[in-house]
Amino acid sequence: MKRYKLFVLLFIPLISSCFDDKGNYDYHEVAEITIEGLPELLEVVGGAEHIVAAPTVKSSLEGIITEDNPNFTFTYKMELKSGGTIVNGAYWGVTLNKNGRKDVDTLAPFAANTYLCMFIVTDIRTGRETAKLFDIKVTSPTYEGWMVLCNEGAQNRVRLDMISVLSKERTLPAYDLLASLGLPEVTNARMLGWAPSRFANPGDVIYLISEKGSYLLDQETFKTDESWNIKAVDFIIPPADEEPVYYISLNSGSSYGGEANFCVTDKGNAYCQALGTAGAAFEYPINTSERGLAPEFKVAPYVGVSMARPGNGNTALFYDTDNRRFVGWSTGTTDNPKQILSPLQDPEEALFSFKTGMELIYMESTRFSNGLVYAILQDQNGQRHIYGINMGGNGFVQESKYENLQAPGFDQASRFAFHSQFPFLFYAEGNKVHMYNLATNTTYESVITLPSTSEVTFLKFNLYQQPLLTLLNDQSEEFMARQFELMVGSYDKNSTDNNGGTLGFYKIDGINNKVSKRTEYSGFARIADVVYRERR
């Protein structure tokens, strides 16, 4: 008991000293931060729509916290909801609002997936953080629509944009889709290879072709990587020191898929992938007279085939640039095992000689006259001529020749497109597009005139390529007419953000020789090719 009294006596001075120190400390209430106005789930189309959020932040002591309040910072962090990381080795490695603003409005350049987003409010006076989570579901824009292949910036970085068809009533441009889908850094885009097939293997084939590498894209997601390089996927022996720059499929009538695929490399070698058997692949160069021998001549980066549907062609047209002559490929026989090219023999009463002695400027496959291929050739005097060779059936039928064209600027033009319903050639000159009537030798100048700061970079008619057009999921008259609209790609030379590209769609009135714009989309880089990703 004595010891207990002593303890109490010793404790009383301590209590007294605490009361004496009252007021020597800064006592304050800790603010409670609440976050309101964020959705539980935000749904966007990847590469096309923006992630938009404008939360309300409240302090129990200060009221509404605005984004200009110097005592607080705001951060949006994003990660895969299912696990793993967006950025390898960096958990929560993606910041949406790099400008630090409370409200976010930024493009969603992410692959299709469900993501977890964390909005963090930090009181920099105390270091205390308050966070709220919400989901972001990114859907794919790649299901159907116009794939727009572009070259971006001074380095011509390859990028794939798209005009996504989400429904009959809704289309939406999407940009730089492959940035998050594994495409290696490549430059100088050339074209998109598109070979639809109903066979389970390989199914629809989509190739991105560039001068620095060509890659197969996943037919649903567009994902790719170095292992999907065309040399690794479709060549028996990957060619060294050469890159495919042209790719096309030949359909000979099957309702399931093509007869053969062809590619031409930057070294002037041609290859054939004869389809119909498992494991079909590109073999040795076919620009030779005997299978497996070394190439005997170089070919131009064009292949002419019939684009009629149902398919009706058994042959393909090439141009020998060394000997300045047309050469041909045909379906296999004992003498021609699908892996050689043969010089074409002039027919009796020929319109022209297949050995032209001229430079091939351009060649295009069409549906006109049930499979006509047009070739633009230039003679030693710089004058240009147009030859028409029908590739339906066994092909190589000389059908038309056009000389002494009354077409101002044609001999200097580098962008061309031939119509498949009317005998019309379209060619570009600066910011203008002219229409030449092959039948009447008449030019309708400046049927399209773009702003003076724009330059035409691309002309094309996108013919649907399903083995049977009746397989297409949209059989409307309007949709079918789209393939006969002229696509005009242009670039604003004053653009400073690498997004000065515009794609316009123009209806052609072949009766009245008129052209009218239906619609256009902008925000692309410099357009190199456009192909419609069809659906059955």
Where are the language model's segments positioned?
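Short coil/turn segments that connect the beta-strands within blades of beta-propeller domains
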Residues: 143-145, 203-204, 258-260, 314, ...
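Preference for solvent-exposed, low-hydrophobicity sequence contexts
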Residues: 177-184, 190, 201-416, 442-444, ...
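Sec-dependent signal peptide recognition
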Residues: 2-9
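Acidic/polar, low-complexity intrinsically disordered N-terminal segments immediately downstream
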Residues: 19-176, 477-483, 491, 495-536
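Short glycine/acidic-enriched loop and turn motifs that connect beta-strands
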Residues: 151-156, 213-215, 268-270, 323-324, ...
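C-terminal motif of bacterial Sec signal peptides marking the signal peptidase cleavage site
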Residues: 14-17
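Repeat-based blade/solenoid architectures
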Residues: 184-189, 347-359, 407-413, 451-471, ...
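Intrinsically disordered, low-complexity segments enriched in Gly and acidic/Ser/Thr residues
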Residues: 381-499
